[in-house]
C-alpha cells in the first residue's frame, strides 16, 4: 500500500529550483516514509476510490506548492529584469561617454597635428622632435592601428541605436568582451598619451620662443620696459605651468583615490548582492521547511482526527492478519512509556537539585558565620593594638586640618551661594516684572485688536449699507440731476446777490471810515476852539460806549471832578475808542453766519433805542451855553476825562464779553454748519436763500439805524459847534451824509429789486417743491439714511483715531519698558562683574585648599608607611592562610570524589530500573504471543492509567491546572476540604480555582 506514497515522495524533489535538487535528493535519502493507513476495505473498487482520493489530495498539495514556487520565481524574474535593465543603462552610458571621450581626444590630436605640420615647415630638421621618446611615432588617430583592435559593435557612433551595443554584448562571450575592452582601453591610453606629448611639445616650443625672444632682446636694442614685461610674463607663464602640473597631479591623485573608493563601493555592493543571494537561499530553505512543517501539521491533524474517532484500533482480526496493532500505535505506546520514564527521571533529578541547593545554602551559611564574626569583633581588642593607636593619632591630626579646610571651604561656598542666590533672585524679579509688563502689553494689544476688529466690522456694514443706498439713489438719478440744475441756477443767483451785498458792505465801510475822519477833524477843531471843544468831546465820547454796551453811560462820582487831565488826551482816547468800536462791529458782521444775523440785527435795533434815549438825556446837560464860567468848565473837563477813562475800561470789558459771545456763537455756527452739511441738498439751498434774505434785511436795518444815529449826531453837533471852521467842516460832513443818503436810496432801490427777484424765485421754488414733493420725500428719506451712515462713519473714524492714539501710547510704553530692560541688563552686568570678583577670591581660597591638600598628602605618606608595617604582618597571616588553602583543595577533591561516586551510583540505579522495565515489557511480549492477549493486557494498562491513582476505583475526571496531573474529582475535592492542598504526585500547591472537571470520551 505504500506505492503511491513512494511515488509522491520521489516526485517532491522536482518542485524546487535546479540549484537545490542535489541537496534535496541528499535530504530525501535520509527521510523515513511512513505507511499510509487506508482503514477497512471490502473491495478493490473501494480501495481504488480511496487511493484516488489520496492522490487528489497530494496533487492539490503539490499544486499549492507549485503555485507558491511560481510566484516566488516570478518575483525573482522581475527583480533580475530590473537589475538587467539598470546594468544595460549603465553600460550604454559608459559606452556613450567613452566614445565621446575618444572623439574629443581624436579632435585634439588632429588640431595638434595640423599645428605641428604648420610649425614644422619653417623649422630646421634638427630642431624637430618626434612624438615618442624612442623615435618611432605612433600612428595617427584615424589610422587602422588604433582602430583595428576595436570592433565596430563596441565603438558605435552616436547616431546608431543603443540596442546594437546590447545585442553585441549578448552575442559575444566574456573572453571576447574582455579582449575588446582591453583593446579599446589601450587605444584610449595611447590617445591620451599623444595628447600629453603634444601639450609637452607645445610647452617646449613656447619655451624656445621665449628664449629666442630673450636672446633677440639682448642683441637688439629694446626698451627696458618691454624686457621687464617679457621677463615678468615668462615668470608668470612658468608659474602657471607649474600650477597646472600640480593641479593635474592633484586631480590624478584624487581620481585614483576616487577609483579606489569606487572599487571599494563596487566590492561592497557585490558583497551586498552576495548576502542578498544568501538571504534568498535561506529564505528558500525556510520556505521549504515551512512547507514541510505544514505537511507534518496536516499529517498530525489527520492522525489526531483518526485517534479521536477511534480509527486506529481494530477489534477484529479481519482487518489485520494475526491481530497485530499498527506501527503508529506502537510508537505512541513507546512514546508514552518514555514520557513516564522521563518524568520519573526528571523528578529524581529535581530531588537531587533540591538536595544540592540545600547543601549549597548550608555551605553559604557556614561561610557567612566567620564573616559575621569578623565584622562583629569586640572594640576593646581592636583598640589595644598599636596600629590602631598610631592610626588614631594620625587621623586626629588629619581630621583637625580637614575641619579647618572644610570650614574655610564652607565659608567660601556660602559666600558664593549667597551671591548666586541674590543674583538669581534679582534676575527672577526682573524676569517677573518683564513678564508682567509683557502680559499687560499683550492684553492691551489684544483689547485694541478686538476693538479694531469691531470697528472694521462696523465700517464694513456701513460701507455695505452705503453702497446699497448709492445703488438705490442711482435709480432717481435723472430727477436729481434736474433738481440740481435748478438749484445750481438759484445758487448762482444767490451768489450774485451776495456779491452785491459785499459790495455794499465795502461802501458802508468806506462811509464809516470817512465818518471817522470827519470825527477826527471835528475833534481837531475842538482843540482850536477851547470854549466849544469840550461840549463836542462830551457829545462824541458819550454815545460810543452807549452804542456798544446798549445802556446808559455811568454817572461820574463827585471825587472824579477833582482830578485834572489835558484836553488833547481826551480827544485821542475818544477817537481810538471809536476806531475800536468800528473794527469789532465789522468783524462781527463778517464772522456771523446767515442763520445768526437775524437775531443780531434785532439786538442792534434794541440797543439803538436806549442809545437814543441816553443821547436825548445827555443832550441838555452836555450843551451848556458858551458864556459859562471857567471854573465850572475845568470841573467839567475833569469829569469828562474820568468818565472817558471809565468808559474805556467798560468798553474793553464789553468788547471781551462780546468776544466770548462771538466765540460761543461761532461754536454754535460750526454745529449748525455740520448739521447744514449733513442735511439734504434741497434743504441746504432753501436755508441758504432764507439766510441770504435775512442777511440782506439785517444789513438794511443796520444801515438805517446807523443813518439815524448819524443824523442825530449831526443835529447835536450842529447845536454844539459855533465856530466857522467847525461849521464848514460840518457842512462838508452834511454833504457827505447827503451823498451817503443818496447812495443809501440807491441801495434801497437795489434791495427792493433784489427782494422782488427773491420773491419771484421763492414762488418758483415753491411751485417746484409742490410738483416734486413725492420725489423730495424719497430723497429726504435716502438722505436721512445717508446722514445716519455718515454720522456712524464719523463715529467709527473717531474711535479709530482714539485706538490709534492708544496704540501710539502703548508703543511709547513698550519703548519705556525696553529702556527699563536695558537698565536691568546693565545691573545684571554689574552683578556678573561682582560674581567674577567673588570667583577670583574663590580661586585664592582654592589655592589655599591645594596647599592644605599637599599637607594632607604628606600625612597620607606617613600613613602609607604605617600601612606597610601592617602589610608585613598581613604577609605572615597569608602564609598561614596559604597552608590552609593547600589543605582545603584536598578536602574538596575527596568530597567531590565521594559526591561523584554517589551520583554515579544513582545513575546506575536509574539505568537498572529502566532496563528492568524494558525487560518486563519484553517478557510480557514473549509471554503473550497472541495479539488478543496483548490487546487485553494493553486495555488493562489503559484502564489502570484511566483510574485515579489515589483511590484506584474511580475514573480520572479532574485536572490540576498548576501541574496538569489528573485525578478523580472526589479525591481532589476531599483533599481540598481536608486542607491537604498539594498534588499527590509532585506536591505542588493548588487553590479553589486550580482544579477543573474533564471528560474523557
Curated annotation (Swiss-Prot):
The keyword Acetylation applies. It comes from the Eukaryota. Pathway: Protein modification; protein ubiquitination. GO terms for cellular component: HULC complex; nucleus; ubiquitin ligase complex. Residues 18-28, 602-619, 633-646 have a biased composition (Basic and acidic residues). Keywords: Acetylation, Chromatin regulator, Coiled coil, Isopeptide bond, Metal-binding, Nucleus, Phosphoprotein, Transferase, Ubl conjugation, Ubl conjugation pathway, Zinc, Zinc-finger. There is a cross-link at residues 578-579 (Glycyl lysine isopeptide (Lys-Gly) (interchain with G-Cter in SUMO2)). It is found in: Nucleus. Its main location: nucleus. This is E3 ubiquitin-protein ligase BRE1B. It comes from Pongo abelii (Sumatran orangutan).
Amino acid at each position: 500500500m505504500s506505492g503511491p506514497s513512494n511515488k509522491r515522495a520521489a516526485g517532491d524533489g522536482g518542485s524546487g529550483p535546479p540549484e537545490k535538487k542535489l541537496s534535496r535528493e541528499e535530504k530525501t535519502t535520509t527521510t523515513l516514509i511512513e505507511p499510509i493507513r487506508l482503514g477497512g476495505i471490502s473491495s478493490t473498487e473501494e480501495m481504488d476510490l480511496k487511493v484516488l482520493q489520496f492522490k487528489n489530495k497530494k496533487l492539490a498539495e503539490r499544486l499549492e506548492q507549485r503555485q507558491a514556487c511560481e510566484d516566488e520565481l516570478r518575483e525573482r524574474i522581475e527583480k533580475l529584469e530590473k537589475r538587467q535593465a539598470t546594468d544595460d543603462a549603465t553600460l550604454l552610458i559608459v559606452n556613450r561617454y567613452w566614445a565621446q571621450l575618444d572623439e574629443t581626444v581624436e579632435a585634439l590630436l588632429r588640431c595638434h597635428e595640423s599645428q605641428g605640420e604648420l610649425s614644422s615647415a619653417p623649422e630646421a630638421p634638427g630642431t624637430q622632435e618626434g612624438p615618442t621618446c624612442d623615435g618611432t611615432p605612433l600612428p595617427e588617430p584615424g589610422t587602422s592601428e588604433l582602430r583595428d583592435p576595436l570592433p565596430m559593435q563596441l565603438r558605435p557612433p552616436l547616431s546608431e541605436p543603443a540596442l546594437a551595443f546590447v545585442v553585441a554584448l549578448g552575442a559575444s562571450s566574456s573572453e571576447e568582451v574582455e579582449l575588446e575592452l582591453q583593446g579599446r582601453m589601450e587605444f584610449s591610453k595611447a590617445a591620451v598619451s599623444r595628447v600629453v606629448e603634444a601639450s609637452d611639445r607645445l610647452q617646449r616650443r613656447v619655451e624656445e620662443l621665449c628664449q629666442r625672444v630673450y636672446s633677440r632682446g639682448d642683441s637688439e636694442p629694446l626698451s627696458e620696459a618691454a624686457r621687464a614685461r617679457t621677463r615678468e610674463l615668462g615668470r608668470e607663464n612658468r608659474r602657471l605651468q607649474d600650477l597646472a602640473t600640480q593641479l593635474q597631479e592633484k586631480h590624478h591623485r584624487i581620481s585614483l583615490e576616487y577609483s579606489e573608493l569606487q572599487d571599494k563601493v563596487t566590492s561592497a555592493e557585490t558583497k551586498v548582492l552576495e548576502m542578498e543571494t544568501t538571504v534568498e537561499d535561506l529564505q528558500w530553505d525556510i520556505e521549504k521547511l515551512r512547507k514541510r512543517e505544514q505537511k507534518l501539521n496536516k499529517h498530525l491533524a489527520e492522525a489526531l482526527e483518526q485517534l479521536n474517532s477511534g480509527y486506529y484500533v481494530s477489534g477484529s482480526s479481519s482487518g489485520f492478519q494475526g491481530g497485530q496493532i499498527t506501527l503508529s500505535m506502537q510508537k505512541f505506546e513507546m512514546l508514552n512509556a518514555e514520557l513516564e520514564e522521563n518524568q520519573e527521571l526528571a523528578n529524581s533529578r529535581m530531588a537531587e537539585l533540591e538536595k544540592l541547593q540545600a547543601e549549597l545554602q548550608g555551605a553559604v551559611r557556614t561561610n557567612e558565620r566567620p564573616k559575621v564574626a569578623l565584622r562583629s569583633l569586640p572594640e576593646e581588642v581592636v583598640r589595644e593594638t598599636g596600629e590602631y593607636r598610631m592610626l588614631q593619632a594620625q587621623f586626629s591630626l588629619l581630621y583637625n586640618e580637614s575641619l579647618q579646610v572644610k570650614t574655610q571651604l564652607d565659608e567660601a561656598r556660602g559666600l558664593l551661594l549667597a551671591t548666586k542666590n541674590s543674583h538669581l533672585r534679582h534676575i527672577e524679579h526682573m524676569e517677573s516684572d518683564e513678564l508682567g509688563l509683557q502680559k499687560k502689553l499683550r492684553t492691551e494689544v489684544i483689547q485694541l485688536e478686538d476693538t479694531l476688529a469691531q470697528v472694521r466690522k462696523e465700517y464694513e456694514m456701513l460701507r455695505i449699507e452705503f453702497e446699497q443706498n448709492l445703488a438705490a439713489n442711482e435709480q432717481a438719478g435723472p430727477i436729481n440731476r434736474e433738481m440740481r440744475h435748478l438749484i445750481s441756477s438759484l445758487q448762482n443767483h444767490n451768489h450774485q446777490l451776495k456779491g452785491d451785498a459785499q459790495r455794499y458792505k465795502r461802501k458802508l465801510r468806506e462811509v464809516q471810515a470817512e465818518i471817522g475822519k470827519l470825527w477826527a477833524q471835528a475833534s481837531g477843531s475842538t482843540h482850536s476852539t477851547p470854549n466849544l471843544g469840550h461840549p463836542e468831546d462830551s457829545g462824541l465820547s458819550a454815545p460810543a460806549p452807549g452804542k456798544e454796551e446798549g445802556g446808559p453811560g455811568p454817572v461820574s462820582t463827585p471825587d472824579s471832578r477833582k482830578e485834572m487831565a489835558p484836553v488833547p488826551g481826551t480827544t485821542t482816547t475818544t477817537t481810538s475808542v471809536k476806531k475800536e468800536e468800528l473794527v469789532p462791529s465789522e468783524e462781527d458782521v463778517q464772522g456771523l453766519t446767515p442763520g445768526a444775523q437775524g437775531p443780531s440785527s434785532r439786538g442792534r435795533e434794541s440797543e439803538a433805542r436806549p442809545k437814543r434815549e441816553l443821547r436825548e438825556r445827555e443832550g441838555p446837560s452836555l450843551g451848556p451855553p458858551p458864556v459859562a464860567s471857567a471854573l465850572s468848565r475845568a470841573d467839567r473837563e475833569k469829569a469828562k476825562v474820568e468818565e472817558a477813562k471809565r468808559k474805556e475800561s467798560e468798553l474793553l470789558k464789553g468788547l471781551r464779553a462780546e468776544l466770548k459771545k462771538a466765540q460761543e456763537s461761532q461754536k454754535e455756527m460750526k454745529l449748525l454748519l455740520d448739521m447744514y452739511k449733513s442735511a439734504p441738498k434741497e434743504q441746504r439751498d432753501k436755508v441758504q436763500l432764507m439766510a441770504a434774505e435775512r442777511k440782506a434785511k439785517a444789513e438794511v436795518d443796520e444801515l438805517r439805524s446807523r443813518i439815524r444815529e448819524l443824523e442825530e449826531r449831526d443835529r447835536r453837533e450842529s447845536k454844539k459847534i459855533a465856530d466857522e471852521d467847525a461849521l464848514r467842516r460840518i457842512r462838508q460832513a452834511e454833504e457827505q451824509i447827503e451823498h451817503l443818503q443818496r447812495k443809501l436810496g440807491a441801495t434801497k432801490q437795489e434791495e427792493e429789486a433784489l427782494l422782488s427777484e427773491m420773491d419771484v424765485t421763492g414762488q418758483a421754488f415753491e411751485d417746484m417743491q409742490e410738483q416734486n414733493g413725492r420725489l423730495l420725500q424719497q430723497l429726504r428719506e435716502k438722505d436721512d439714511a445717508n446722514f445716519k451712515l455718515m454720522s456712524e462713519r464719523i463715529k467709527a473714524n473717531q474711535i479709530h483715531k482714539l485706538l490709534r492714539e492708544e496704540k501710539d501710547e502703548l508703543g511709547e510704553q513698550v519703548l519705556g519698558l525696553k529702556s527699563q530692560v536695558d537698565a536691568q541688563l546693565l545691573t545684571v552686568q554689574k552683578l556678573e562683574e561682582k560674581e567674577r570678583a567673588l570667583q577670583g577670591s574663590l580661586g585664592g581660597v582654592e589655592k589655599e585648599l591645594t596647599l592644605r591638600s599637599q599637607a594632607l598628602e604628606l600625612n597620607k605618606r606617613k600613613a602609607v608607611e604605617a600601612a606597610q608595617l601592617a602589610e608585613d604582618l598581613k604577609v605572615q597571616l597569608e602564609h598561614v592562610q596559604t597552608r590552609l588553602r593547600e589543605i582545603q583543595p584536598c578536602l574538596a577533591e575527596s568530597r567531590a570524589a565521594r559526591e561523584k561516586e554517589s551520583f554515579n551510583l544513582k545513575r546506575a540505579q536509574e539505568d537498572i530500573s529502566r532496563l528492568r522495565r524494558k525487560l518486563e515489557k519484553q517478557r510480557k511480549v514473549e509471554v503473550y504471543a497472541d495479539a488478543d492477549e496483548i490487546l487485553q493486557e494493553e486495555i488493562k494498562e489503559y484502564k489502570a492509567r484511566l483510574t485515579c491513582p489515589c483511590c484506584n476505583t474511580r475514573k480520572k475526571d479532574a485536572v490540576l491546572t498548576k501541574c496538569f496531573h489528573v485525578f478523580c474529582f472526589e479525591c481532589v475535592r476531599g483533599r481540598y476540604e481536608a486542607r491537604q492542598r498539594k498534588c499527590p504526585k509532585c506536591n505542588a500547591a493548588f487553590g479553589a480555582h486550580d482544579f477543573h472537571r474533564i471528560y474523557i470520551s
